[in-house]
A protein has these predicted regions:
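Short, solvent-exposed loop/beta-turn-alpha elements that line the ligand-binding surface or hinge
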Residues: 70-77, 227-236, 303-311
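Bacterial N-terminal signal peptides that target proteins for export
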Residues: 1-11
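Secondary-structure end/capping motifs
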Residues: 250-325
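Pocket-lining segment of extracytoplasmic ligand-binding domains
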Residues: 107-108, 116, 182, 188-281
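Solvent-exposed, polar/charged alpha-helical surfaces in well-ordered, non-transmembrane soluble domains
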Residues: 61-69, 88, 92, 96, ...
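C-terminal motif of bacterial Sec signal peptides marking the signal peptidase cleavage site
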Residues: 18-22
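Short, glycine-/small- and polar/acidic-enriched structural segments
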Residues: 30-32, 36-176, 180-183, 200-206, ...
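Bacterial signal peptide processing site
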Residues: 24-26
Length: 326
């Protein structure tokens, strides 16, 4: 019950954040309209340098065009970007106020919200699902085909397990009785098991799928878990990453937050439309090898989802996580 209350509180917080950002993006009153505002016009918000972190991987890929453009004002750069190797490098800095925004896993956003009692809030979804069932063979054409099979995977007790178990259950498959889930410590162990022939089916995220395909002849993406989730048609979505911000920063600099979201959306559009050039930047920033990025990008589901669509998709996904690990 406690987790459920926190979940609904998170939904309300999302609504508050979106209203703040929307207000920041409203156009100014037309001075020629003949209308006199009831209150004095506020001065334009002074430019501020937003400190933004992202984890190396798909959740950082949509940022590369914005990072490369390095927009600035008379006061200096608008953004100070940091790329981190793990969430452990980002979480303390965000809580201490050393960062203003961050691209993090969706489940971590919920943890941060609860841990800080609302001091960290969600602004946007930036990555949908990146999980795939891969197979060295042709036996798996649907989730039902996993019955009686062994699937090697990493991420027990986290999103990969919760997402797979949820999808199996929703498709009438008992994940404990109908499928053998062989959990490994790292995704690289799953790739090794496939390469050695010890396993023929695995659950892997991008870009590990692309890396595995480069090493194993005939390995194919049998099932896209994002598509399987969408088939449920329940209004939610399989979500990998979100953009979070400190509540204090959002309240103090709503225009800066609104401008960042607009710039980020444009960066995402460019990345998705210019795969080769985007992959080169991704490699240049050390996020993922450029050759791997070019092949993986079309399957990484890089997005910028805000507004009503965010309020529809994210709570439904988080509810699945809470039900799996209340």
């Amino acid at each position: 019950m406690k987790s459920l209350k926190k979940f609904f509180a998170l939904c309300l917080t999302l609504a508050l954040v979106l209203s703040l950002v929307a207000c920041a993006q409203k156009p100014a009153e037309d001075p020629d309209s003949g209308e006199t505002p009831d209150t004095p016009v506020q001065e334009t918000e002074a430019p501020v340098t937003a400190r933004i972190a992202a984890l190396k991987g798909p959740t950082a890929m949509g940022l590369v065009k914005l990072m490369s453009d390095a927009p600035s004002s008379a006061n200096g750069p608008l953004y100070d970007f940091t790329l981190a190797g793990s969430a452990d490098e980002v979480t303390p800095a965000l809580i201490k106020g050393e960062l203003d925004m961050a691209c993090v896993p969706a489940n971590l956003a919920a943890v941060l919200y609860n841990k800080t009692e609302g001091a960290v809030q969600v602004l946007a979804v930036n990555t949908l699902g990146v999980l795939y069932i891969v197979e060295n063979g042709e036996s798996v054409q649907s989730l039902a085909d996993l019955k009686g099979k062994t699937v090697v995977a990493a991420g027990k007790g986290s999103t990969p397990e919760y997402a797979l178990r949820y999808l199996l259950s929703e498709n009438g498959i008992d994940p404990d009785a109908d499928v053998t889930l062989d959990w490994k410590s790292e995704h690289s162990e799953c790739v090794a098991a496939l390469a050695s022939g010890q396993a023929s089916i695995a659950l892997l995220p991008q870009p590990f799928v692309t890396v595995a395909q480069s090493k194993i002849d005939g390995l194919r993406m049998a099932l896209d878990l994002t598509e399987e989730w969408d088939k449920l048609d329940n209004g939610s979505a399989l979500i990998t990453g979100v953009i979070v911000a400190r509540s204090e920063f959002v309240e103090a600099h709503p225009a800066a937050v609104g401008s960042f979201l607009s710039a980020y959306a444009a960066s995402v559009d460019w990345v998705n439309a210019n795969t080769a050039d985007a992959a080169a930047l991704i490699g240049e920033y050390g996020i993922v090898d450029a050759a791997v990025a070019e092949k993986a990008l079309p399957y990484c589901n890089i997005v910028c989802i805000t507004g009503a669509e965010l309020l529809e998709k994210l709570p439904g996904y988080l509810s699945v996580l809470y039900n799996a690990d209340p």
